[in-house]
Amino acid sequence: MKYRVRDILEYTIAIVSEFASKFNLTEKQAYRYINFHKGLNFIEENYGIIHTLDFNEAVDSDAIFCRKNGGEL
């Protein structure tokens, strides 16, 4: 299924914002961390599934993915 780029971007922005709150980061720091550890790719590639999850579960899934790629949060 094809998803609109706008939907993916809006969801990604929301995930970054919630990630920042959860880990006490600025949104800029959260974006850089998630991007560096390939979490943005994870969101984009798995949008079809991840956007159906509970929002906190989606943030946790992205955090786990980032940890698997060297992140420490």
Where in this protein do the model-derived segments appear?
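C-terminal alpha-helical interaction appendages
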Residues: 1-73
